[in-house]
């Protein structure tokens, strides 16, 4: 049996520590939360990716009554980026979320297992 480790690195920074591009990505991810369709969880998530060619793509979570067949913001964003820019790998990803009160979360939002797998396969 062959054994190997799969790791994911997540950087958590304060807003005043972000680079100019990271600030742009955060803004795009926050904007994307307003395009979320989340009537069941009322947890609006947006994601934005910067591609190697400098393009930025954003996406939001999309729910439906046939749970769990909705899509997370990360996969919506990554799948669109891959179909639109197939030759430009993802450089970095930013995630933003608003809670049921409509306020942005103060704690980081980590990708779910399905999104982590999609990220792993996108590398």
Model-predicted segments: where are they?
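Short, compositionally biased leader-like segments
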Residues: 1-27
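Short Pro/Gly-enriched beta-strand edge/turn motifs at strand-loop
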Residues: 27-34
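Extended beta-strand/beta-hairpin segments
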Residues: 35-41
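Short glycine/proline-enriched turns and hinge-like loops at secondary-structure junctions
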Residues: 41-42, 71
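Short beta-strand scaffold segments in enzyme catalytic cores
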Residues: 42-51
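Zn2+-dependent cytidine deaminase-like catalytic core
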Residues: 58-123
């Amino acid at each position: 049996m062959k054994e190997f480790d799969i790791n994911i690195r997540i950087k958590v920074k304060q807003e005043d520590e972000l680079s100019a591009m990271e600030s742009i990505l955060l803004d795009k991810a926050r904007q994307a939360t307003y395009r979320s369709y989340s009537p069941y969880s009322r947890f609006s998530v947006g994601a934005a990716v910067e591609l190697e060619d400098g393009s930025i793509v954003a996406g939001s979570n999309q729910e439906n009554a046939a749970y769990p067949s909705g899509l997370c913001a990360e996969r919506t964003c990554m799948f669109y980026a891959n179909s639109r820019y197939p030759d430009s790998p993802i450089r970095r990803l930013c995630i933003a979320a608003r809670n049921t009160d409509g306020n942005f979360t103060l704690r980081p939002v980590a990708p779910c297992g399905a999104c982590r797998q999609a990220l792993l396969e996108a590398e």
